[in-house]
Structures are given as structure tokens and as C-alpha cells.
């Protein structure tokens, strides 16, 4: 593996993407069988991509797959296996020295495993023995709230519904979820603003909009199929404007791999008509600057007798809180807005002008907006901006949060939440004949805090890499090994499995691409994409191992063992997933005719009240919500520091690292790097390729013990006073206390640091 730093000249997509897919296929897959399966991905009769949550177009290409989707499926259907012989040769202690890429690259898990402390190895056992032992441990706890039930966004609606049903019959609302670490500010912030914790747009709205503002996200790496929609809107004359600390190739230009002309001529489409490098932590200041200019210009237009820039009728009819917002933004000083955002008043005026001129605007955002101490307020400022011109609830306009995992939104819809509504619990109890717990449970941060204090005794993980994804890894590693029970439902080995509890189990499950055969035949599961479309997913490949079970079957097996007097007919439900969907429909009325509607190509759309201008808020209207001040990260407010954000590389999906390259940013064969602007490098007196140390700072600006040593400097076009490193290696630079008090999301995108040369 050759290490080099070399500027990448190509557009996003193109032959670079094709070559990357070919390499992934060559290294992981049986080309004769498995590559054919890619043609079934994101198709009505096929399986849903296990990667991102970008929706499927109604009329998709014959090969509707992106580079990172291809990597995800190649990673899943690899012919490499992690079995008993693998663990006979590798102790847990030795595996802890492996890199995270190496661990997952070892292959698919194919049989149930139990950790043996004497040999320091995982050893195989039967499914029934695993279920019985796990059930016995769960029965031994005096308080159901001593168990944490973690969920990954790869879990299907059916498995997630059974999982929450099991946990609630057991007696707990402890549901730490991967969404707590990515888009919880969306769920909390949008619900308070517009009454629905989800985006309001459909894919068709991108065909009708005049302007798309992309802020705080990187589609070229995190949701590449979005580039096709951006390309199409630019081709028809609409505009896209990018706001991001780094220049990301996927926001700049794109060569569509499915377009023969662009591929053969090596041509490309310019995406962003303008690109603004806001400083890390400067989004709120920028947004308030835009709103101030809009209000001032609207006032001037009114005084001169010209038409209003704002949608006064919409504001008066559909909203409350505008007067308070108006006072707040007009009191924001330009010197502070410019200092915090890193953009000039002139640049912000350009943005405001573009927004004012557009009749229909969509704002797309990702974790660059959410992963801050005031991430919830960030989301609400985006809503405020849209509400000012009536850009919610009309075609071609709205708010578009870009979710990560393919079903992270669906899991929440069917009950994976630590704060369930009274109505949901009443319907659940009525359907099954038991009284669910009503006390709020733990989200991710509270869950890890309970583990660290010894309050929690057991952790069950439905997928994911909980230990690696959380902040303050060094502080939490030892407490995780002091748990009484750890159960990991997984397809591949990861670091969380190696932090073994007194009783640790790995339970292997089918991948999204594999045939799920139950008593009544092959089963389909369902997922919900970022735009609230529900559709079926049917595996087409032979399972990687004969002992693999479905997630639904694993949940049912544990539940039957842990709850011998259960009121739920677990085995009956798993025989035919239509039965699970019938129960979901009974508990959640929005899923009416569930089984009938998922049999239609493309599935169905869950009604979004806000998109219809029905505001399910206490006020009965959409709320302008004011956030005091300009700082989205108060603990980073002092001036004697740099601010670091964590990001994925291009060869990565969440904690899964497919390879060591970050092609679009010009990094190859390595991950121990720190990105900074040429201006910042000059200020810090460092050069491209030099090694530096980063030391995390406390809220009062003092050096902490958390550090990253010998990172290679990569000079990159980006905002000053901003540094970028890779997630999850840099997660330990953040404490569990550094999170948004409203949503609980960790502040991964704004960590105060100090830089020093390495010796």
C-alpha cells in the first residue's frame, strides 16, 4: 500500500469511481455470482443498498448504484469468513492490535460465538445454547433498566419493531441508537419547529426547485447517488450553492458513471455555482447574517413601496415567533458574524441575494450542521430561513436532512426511541396485552454514562460498532469490559466485540443482500429512506453460512429465552414477516395497508403533515425558534485555539473503513493526517507533510490529556482556524460531556485543540 499525498484532479464519479468499484469487487467478491447481484440493488424486486438513505428514483437506471454502495455490497458478500478456525489462531488480545480496517476485512461472521476468558478466544456454540445463556443472564437482573438496547441504522423495520417490543416487554425504554450520534438534532429540532422530526421534500421536488443550498455535508462520499439529482437540476438551469469548511469535490463537479457521453468524452458537470468556506462552528452566525440582510432589505422594500422579499401572508397565517426572531437577528453585530463565520458581509450578502431571488428553495444539510453543542438550534435556524419565504409545504421547496444508514429513520419510526409517546405505548400495550414502561430511558450518551458509572450491567447491540462510534473511547473502554453481559448481533467483526464483558456473545446474521428463508418461504423486509418512502428489500444471494439467522429470528430467540411467560407469539411472527407488518400497522396507523402497499413497485410514502402545511405543534403553527447569540459551540468560545472537526474518508462508511484512501482529498494509503488551509499552516508555521501533535482543550482553554500525535499535515483548500481529522480515530478527543443538551448529540464537529510540532 503506497502512501502519498497527491491532489486529485478528476471530477467526482467518473473513471475514478469505476476503478474504485472494480478494485473492491476484485478483492472481496466472487465475480461469477455476486457481481450479478448488484443489478438487483435498489430495484423493486431486489434488495436495498445497505449504505446511505438516499431515495430510489421512480425510473431508475439498469445499474442504479454508486461507488460507495458498490463498496458496501462487496464488503457484505465477501467470500472471506471469520469462523472457529480464525479464532483458534487469533486471541482477543492479539486482535486488539489489528486496525479497524483489518478487523472487518477478515470476513463474514458465520456461526454463534461465546468468549472464553481462559483461552482469550471466541468459541462456537449452538444457537439454542446462546439464546438460553443470554436469556438466563437477562432474567438475573433485578432492574430491567440495567440493560442497554443499542440499535444500528442497518436494522430493518421488522427487526427494529420486534426489538423494541422485546425490550419494552422486558421493562426498559433504554434505546441508544446510532441516530443519537448523527441526526438527533433533526428529530428534536424539526419536531419543535414544524411538528415533524423528518425532512419535508420528495425526490420530485428536486425537479421543481430554483435553488438548492447544500450546507454541512459531502454528497460525493456520503450519499453519491444524490449527485445525479444535483446534476439534473443544474442541467435544467436551477442553481446549487455549497457552504462547507472544506472544498469537497462532490459539491464542485461530477461525471456521471451512468452517462456514456460524459464517460467517453471525460466531460463533467459543474455543480455549485458558488462555494463558501464557512469556518467550523460558524454556521449559525452565517445563517443569522443571511436572515438579518433579508429582514433589512424587506424593510427597505416596504418603505419604498416595493413588493416584499418575505412571504408575509405565509408568516402571518402559518407561523408564530417571527417578531422575536426579528429582534434577535437585527441585534447580531456584523463584526461578530464575520469573525465567527469567517465570511465577509459581502459574501453573506451574495448568499442572501441568491436566496431572495429564488421562488422555490431546498436546503440540504448533514452532520456539519447537527454535530455541535447547539446542533438542534442550528437545524432550527435553517427552518427559520425557509419559513421566512414560505419554503416549507410547497412543491420544489423544503428542508432535506441527509440521513446516514439506510434505515436509521425507519428504526425510529417503528419505536426505537428512549422517549416514546403515550399514544404509541397505549397502542403497543393494547395490541399485545401488557403494560409497557413509560419512564424515559437512555439515549447513546446517557447509555455510555450508565456503563461508565456501573449503573448498566448489560449491553445488547443490534449491529453497529458502539464503542468505536462514541466519544471518549479511553474513558469508556474499561467500563465496557466490566459489564456482566455483552451481546453483539453482527455480520462482521469489529472493535466493540473485542471489549469483552464477563459474558460476551457474537450472533451472526444475514446481510441485506442474502435470501431470508423462514417457515412460510423467502421473506422481504422494509426500510424507510431519508424522504419517508417505505419500500421492500428482498435478498437474492445464498447466505454466507448455513448457520446464519435473520435479525428478526435472533430477536425472537433472545426474547423467548429471556421472557418464558411472554405474551408475544415470537415464533409465529418470525414464520412470516407479513405478520410483523400487520402488528406494526395496528400500532402505527400511518402504516395502513402496509403489506399491500409494499408490494407496489417503489413502495409508499409516509404522510408528512408539515409538507402539507399542517403543523402538529402545540401552537398549531410552524414556530420561528430563536437561539440566543451566534455560537453553536459555547465550549469553543475562547479565542486562543483552533477548532477540529471529524469526518469520514472516501473509503469509509460510518465506522466501517473499506480502505485507506481518501481519493477526492488526495490522501492515499494512510489515515493519520490533519487537514488545514495554507493560511492556517503559515500561521502555525508548519509545512505540507510535516508531523504535528494535536492536544484537546478544556472549555476554559487549558490543555487536556487527550491528544493525537504525529499527524501528517495536508494543506487543503478550506476555511482558516479550522482543522479536520478522520472519524473514528479522533473520537477520543471529545468527552462525553461535550454534547447538545437538547438532543444529546456529541460535538464531533467542533473540538477545541492546540497544535504543536512533533519531535
UniProtKB/Swiss-Prot annotation:
Q: Does the keyword Protein transport apply?
A: no
Q: Where does [4Fe-4S] cluster bind?
A: 49, 52
Q: GO:BP terms for this protein? A: response to acidic pH
State one molecular function term (GO).
Answer: formate dehydrogenase (NAD+) activity
Q: Which Pfam families match?
A: Molybdopterin
Q: Which factors induce or repress this protein, as stated in its UniProt record?
A: By EvgA.
UniProt keywords (A-Z) are: 4Fe-4S, Iron, Iron-sulfur, Metal-binding, Molybdenum, Oxidoreductase
Which InterPro entries does the UniProt record give?
Asp_de-COase-like_dom_sf, MopB_CT_YdeP, Mopterin_OxRdtase, Mopterin_OxRdtse_a_bac, Prok_molybdopt-oxidoreductase, YdeP_MopB
Q: Kindly state what the record says about how the cofactor is bound.
A: Binds 1 [4Fe-4S] cluster. Binds 1 molybdenum-bis(molybdopterin guanine dinucleotide) (Mo-bis-MGD) cofactor per subunit.
**Which cofactor does the UniProt annotation name?**
[4Fe-4S] cluster; Mo-bis(molybdopterin guanine dinucleotide)
- Record's GO cellular component terms: membrane
- Which PANTHER family has this protein been placed in? PROTEIN YDEP (PTHR43105:SF4), RESPIRATORY NITRATE REDUCTASE (PTHR43105)
Instruction: Give the family this protein belongs to, as stated in its UniProt record.
Output: Belongs to the prokaryotic molybdopterin-containing oxidoreductase family.
Q: What does this protein do?
A: Probably involved in acid resistance.
- Name the chain's protein: Protein YdeP
Amino acid at each position: 500500500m503506497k502512501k502519498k499525498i497527491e491532489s486529485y484532479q478528476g471530477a467526482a464519479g467518473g473513471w475514478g469511481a469505476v476503478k474504485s468499484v472494480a478494485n473492491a469487487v476484485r478483492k472481496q467478491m466472487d465475480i461469477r455470482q455476486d457481481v450479478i447481484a448488484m443489478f438487483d440493488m435498489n430495484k423493486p424486486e431486489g434488495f436495498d443498498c445497505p449504505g446511505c438513505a438516499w431515495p430510489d428514483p421512480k425510473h431508475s437506471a439498469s445499474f442504479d448504484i454508486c461507488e460507495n454502495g458498490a463498496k458496501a455490497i462487496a464488503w457484505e458478500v465477501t467470500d472471506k469468513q471469520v469462523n472457529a478456525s480464525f479464532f483458534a489462531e487469533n486471541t482477543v488480545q492479539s486482535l486488539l492490535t489489528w486496525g479497524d480496517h483489518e478487523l472487518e476485512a477478515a470476513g463474514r461472521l458465520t456461526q454463534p460465538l461465546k468468549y472464553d476468558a481462559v483461552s482469550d478466544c471466541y468459541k462456537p456454540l449452538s444457537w439454542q445454547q446462546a439464546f438460553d445463556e443470554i436469556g438466563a443472564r437477562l432474567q438475573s437482573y433485578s432492574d430491567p433498566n440495567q440493560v442497554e438496547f443499542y440499535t444500528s441504522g442497518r436494522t430493518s423495520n421488522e427487526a427494529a419493531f420486534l426489538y423494541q417490543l422485546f425490550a419494552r416487554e422486558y421493562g426498559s425504554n433504554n434505546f441508544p441508537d446510532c441516530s443519537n450520534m448523527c441526526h438527533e438534532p433533526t428529530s428534536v429540532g424539526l419536531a419543535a419547529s414544524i411538528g415533524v422530526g423528518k425532512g419535508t421534500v420528495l425526490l420530485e421536488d428536486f425537479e421543481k426547485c430554483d435553488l438548492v443550498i447544500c450546507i454541512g455535508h459531502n454528497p460525493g462520499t456520503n450519499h453519491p447517488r444524490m449527485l445525479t439529482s444535483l446534476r439534473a437540476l443544474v442541467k435544467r438551469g436551477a442553481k446549487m450553492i455549497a457552504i462547507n469548511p472544506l472544498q469537497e469535490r462532490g459539491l464542485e463537479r461530477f461525471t456521471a458513471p451512468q452517462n456514456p457521453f460524459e464517460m467517453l468524452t471525460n466531460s463533467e458537470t459543474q455543480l455549485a455555482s458558488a462555494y463558501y468556506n464557512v469556518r467550523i462552528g460558524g454556521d449559525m452566525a452565517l445563517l443569522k447574517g443571511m436572515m438579518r440582510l433579508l429582514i433589512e432589505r424587506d424593510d427597505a422594500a416596504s418603505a419604498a413601496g416595493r413588493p416584499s422579499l418575505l412571504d408575509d401572508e405565509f408568516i402571518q397565517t402559518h407561523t408564530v415567533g417571527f417578531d422575536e426572531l426579528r429582534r434577535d437577528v437585527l441585534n447580531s453585530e456584523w463584526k461578530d458574524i464575520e469573525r465567527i463565520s469567517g465570511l465577509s458581509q459581502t459574501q453573506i450578502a451574495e448568499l442572501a441575494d441568491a436566496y431572495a431571488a429564488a421562488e422555490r428553495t431546498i436546503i440540504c444539510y448533514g452532520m456539519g450542521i447537527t454535530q455541535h453543542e447547539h446542533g438542534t438550534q442550528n437545524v432550527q435556524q435553517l427552518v427559520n430561513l425557509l419559513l421566512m419565504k414560505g419554503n416549507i409545504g410547497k412543491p420544489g421547496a423544503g428542508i432535506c436532512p441527509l440521513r446516514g444508514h439506510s434505515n436509521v429513520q425507519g428504526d425510529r419510526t417503528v419505536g426505537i426511541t428512549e422517549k416514546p409517546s403515550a399514544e404509541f405505548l397505549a397502542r403497543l400495550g393494547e395490541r399485545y396485552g401488557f403494560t409497557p414502561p413509560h419512564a424515559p430511558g437512555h439515549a447513546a450518551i446517557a447509555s455510555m454514562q450508565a456503563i461508565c458509572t456501573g449503573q448498566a450491567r448489560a449491553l445488547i447491540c443490534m449491529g453497529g460498532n458502539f464503542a468505536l462510534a462514541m466519544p471518549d473511547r479511553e474513558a469508556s473502554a474499561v467500563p465496557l469490559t466490566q459489564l456482566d453481559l455483552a451481546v453483539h448481533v453482527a455480520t462482521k467483526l469489529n472493535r466493540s466485540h473485542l471489549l469483552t464483558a464477563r459474558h460476551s456473545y457474537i450472533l451472526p446474521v444475514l446481510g441485506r443482500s442474502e435470501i431470508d428463508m423462514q417457515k412460510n418461504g423467502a421473506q422481504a423486509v422494509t426500510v424507510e429512506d431519508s424522504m419517508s418512502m417505505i419500500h421492500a428489500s428482498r435478498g437474492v444471494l445464498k447466505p454466507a453460512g448455513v448457520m446464519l439467522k435473520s435479525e428478526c429470528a435472533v430477536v425472537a430467540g433472545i426474547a423467548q429465552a429471556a421472557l418464558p411467560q411472554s405474551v408475544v407469539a415470537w415464533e409465529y411472527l418470525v414464520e412470516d414477516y407479513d405478520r410483523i407488518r400487520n402488528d406494526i400497522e395496528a400500532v402505527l396507523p400511518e402504516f395502513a395497508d402496509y403489506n399491500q402497499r409494499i408490494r407496489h413497485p417503489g413502495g409508499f410514502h409516509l404522510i408528512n403533515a408539515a409538507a402539507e402545511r399542517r403543523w402538529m405543534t402545540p401552537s398549531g403553527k410552524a414556530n420561528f425558534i430563536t437561539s440566543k447569540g451566534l455560537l453553536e459551540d459555547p465550549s469553543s468560545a475562547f479565542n486562543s485555539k483552533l477548532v477540529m472537526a471529524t469526518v469520514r474518508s472516501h473509503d469509509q462508511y460510518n465506522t466501517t473503513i473499506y480502505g485507506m484512501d481518501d481519493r477526492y482529498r488526495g490522501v492515499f494509503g494512510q489515515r493519520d493526517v490533519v487537514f488545514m488551509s495554507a493560511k492556517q499552516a503559515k500561521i502555525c508555521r508548519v509545512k505540507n507533510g510535516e508531523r504535528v501533535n494535536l492536544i484537546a482543550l478544556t472549555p476554559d482553554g487549558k490543555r487536556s490529556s487527550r491528544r493525537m500525535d504525529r499527524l501528517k499535515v495536508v494543506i487543503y483548500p478550506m476555511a482558516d482556524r479550522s482543522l479536520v481529522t478522520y472519524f473514528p480515530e479522533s473520537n477520543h478527543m471529545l468527552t462525553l460531556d461535550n454534547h447538545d443538551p437538547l438532543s444529546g448529540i456529541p460535538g464531533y464537529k467542533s473540538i477545541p485543540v492546540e497544535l504543536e510540532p512533533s519531535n
